[in-house]
Design a protein with these regions (language model features):
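Alpha-helical membrane insertion/targeting regions
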Residues: 1-139
Length: 139
């Protein structure tokens, strides 16, 4: 079993505190009508949560898979960088009236930043995967 440093847990729980509401809001917004006042309000919250969670995740060291840079960053951190780029790009697109580009970027953000990243986070050897699927970590 991997021994995680104490600040690792703080970062992971802060990441969870932002990603879980982002996932709920993102899912809700994907299935609801677009363009309403509520959509615009929730969209801003969603983007702030995604930017925050991606920024927090950059400080979480990779303990599973290859470490690509500075013995800290792994492949999953590439999704953080893409999220940090996509959030303002999607916001700028909608402010310019580029709804098709905005829609594409938001779907990309949801699939890449939430679904794919979430899948990799639950893999064996990662903290959340071990927490959910390995009863030894809970005891």
């Amino acid at each position: 079993m991997i021994e995680y440093p104490l600040n690792y847990y703080t970062l992971v729980y802060a990441h969870l505190a932002t990603i879980l509401p982002a996932f709920a809001i993102g899912t809700y917004m994907m299935i609801r009508q677009k363009g309403s006042t509520q959509h615009k309000f929730l969209g801003k919250i969603y983007l702030l949560l995604m930017l925050t969670t991606a920024s927090i995740a950059l400080f979480i060291p990779a303990f599973a898979g290859p470490r690509l840079l500075l013995n800290h960053f792994g492949l999953i951190h590439l999704l953080c960088i893409l999220t940090i780029y996509t959030c303002p790009a999607a916001y700028i697109a909608i402010k310019k009236g580029e709804t098709k580009k905005h829609r594409y970027l938001m779907i990309y953000l949801y699939v890449g930043g939430l679904i794919i990243a979430g899948f990799f986070t639950l893999m064996p050897g990662r903290f959340l995967g071990e927490l959910l699927f390995n009863s030894k970590l809970l005891s």
